[in-house]
A protein has these predicted regions:
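Intrinsic-disorder/low-complexity detector
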Residues: 1-191
Length: 191
């Protein structure tokens, strides 16, 4: 249950245009880490917090604080979130919905310490792609495009992401996942 003090602070921020309380943002991140569910309400809260509290000092964040996927963005935390979503999708396509997915095992590490998680995730992904003869090539191409954005030859993975960058990671993950469902829905309508 939400604290009455937090609810009051959020309402004051909404009505006065003041910054949102950090506790709101931190509680959303804790919930996402606990259940690994990124839904519309949580993504909207992250976006609202970052727009109100962080973009005055980091105007470059505005490019990804949109409603939908920004495929042109080179912002590392956002691209890493997108990459994680594609790795998850490649695993689901190759293996089906298994009991333990990369999201279950690696979401927390990937969103906080990408340098530790992503090399392992990419090794696992090679295994997944080899099992998916139908769609593996497509995922490989999309993943390659994101690795290019990250300058994979140099130092693509930060050792740590700040709390704000973790929010950008989560938004990248959410936007990429929603784009997957949107494209599927659109192609189903055409058939």
């Amino acid at each position: 249950a939400a604290s009455p003090l937090l609810a009051g602070a959020v309402m004051r921020a909404i009505l006065s245009g003041a910054p949102y309380p950090a506790m709101l943002y931190e509680s959303i991140l804790v919930r996402i880490r606990a259940d690994r569910v990124v839904n519309r309400a949580r993504a909207a809260t992250i976006k609202a917090y970052l727009l109100q509290n962080v973009t005055p000092t980091h105007p470059e964040y505005k490019e990804v604080l949109q409603v939908a996927l920004n495929e042109q963005s080179d912002l590392k935390p956002y691209v890493l979130g997108r990459l994680f979503s594609l790795l998850e999708q490649a695993q689901e396509s190759a293996l089906g919905l298994k009991s333990a997915t990369i999201t279950d095992r690696y979401f927390d590490a990937a969103s906080a310490t990408p340098k530790l998680a992503f090399p392992t995730l990419l090794k696992l992904n090679r295994h997944h792609l080899s099992k998916d003869v139908d769609w593996g090539w497509r995922y490989e191409r999309q993943i390659g495009e994101l690795l290019t954005k990250l300058n994979a030859e140099e130092d693509p993975y930060p050792a740590r992401l700040t709390l704000e960058e973790q929010g950008l990671f989560i938004l990248g993950y959410y936007h990429q996942k929603q784009a997957r469902y949107t494209k599927k829905t659109d192609s189903e309508k055409e058939n």
